[in-house]
Amino acid sequence: MITSKPKKRYAFIDVQNTASTTRKLLGFLIDWHKLYSYLTLKWKCEKVFFYSGIDEGDDETAKEFESLKGAGCIVKTRTVFSYKKPDKTISIKCIACGKENVEVVSMGYNHKSNCDVDLTVDAVEEAGPDKEFLIFTGDGDFDYLIKKIVEKGTKVYVVSSNAGIKKPGLNTKRLSTRLKEVMKQHEQGKIDLINIDSWKMKIQKEV
């Protein structure tokens, strides 16, 4: 009787996206050491990759990820840089006098670290029919990556949340529509969603 070898399981964690999902949407912070333990003990992950931007001078976060590296994680960090979003011009017409007033509104800054590139390169290099990947992100920019690694025979679990935020003037889902489309396009069992909500009691940070 021929038995198939168990597949190697790796985790790739988009730290910013995952942390934002649990904090803003689900109301809890992740203890990254607990998550690492859960992935290695419960899910039998042989490799766990963390990708994170770190603000210049943020020694506390830098030390935390050094500690994860010491525990056995593969940690890749980049310095966060900021760039200004284009200002928005609003034109308001006075009903009484008919005069048009133009106001320039600052839209603030975006913060990027370009860790997506590192995650993409590592995942493509590691992919193969003998692997299963847990990819922690809800970011639609990873739709093409997921297609490619599935084509290489790798089973993919997308770890995020399908929950949404509903407020007056705001109705948004954390899991990108593009990722949902990728899941629909593939046969059942090739790409599955794991709702990180269900892991809360195992991975949340005590505050």
What are these regions (language model features)?
Residues 74-207:
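Nuclease catalytic cores that cleave nucleic-acid phosphodiester bonds
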Residues 1-107, 150-151, 155, 161-165:
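Domain-level signal for Mg2+-assisted phosphodiester chemistry and nucleotide/NA-binding surfaces
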